[in-house]
Amino acid sequence: MNSKFDRIIHHMEKLNYTWDEQFKDTGLVCEQLEKDEFQPDVIVGISRGGLIPGVMMSHKLNVPFKPVHASTRDFPHWENYLPRPSDKKILIVDDICDSGETFEKLSTYIKENINHECDVRFMSLWWNNESEFEPHYFVKEVAKFTNPVWIEFAHENWWI
């Protein structure tokens, strides 16, 4: 263990989220979008966790994909490719919505600086249902404050 962060995670319950689960759940989210009749103009994948499901959804829905490096630590410095002012329907994707703070800040930034009339929606494969922010689309829920758990995504440990 190299850091305080590693020691904290070592003592938490771990949930292993496999490639098969992620592929299946990403497909389920695409079905939710279709049922909701929401066809985004662009999918924004938050680095790093939102890149894989974002790219998968981009191919399935035949929609442009834009990666963005966004975290609450970096706010308001958003790197890479943000939506264009002409993008009216924007789907922002991440692997997990823990507190929702990154989603909220990115939504505010887009609406204040790019297009204040756009429809910004959020998708995460996992949602911490004890946070105040609820994404529009998600597949799995966890109560991370009551039951501290670390969700280990396949892309985080594929070489082990």
Task: Outline where the language-model segments fall.
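PRPP-associated nucleotide enzymes
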Residues: 1-160
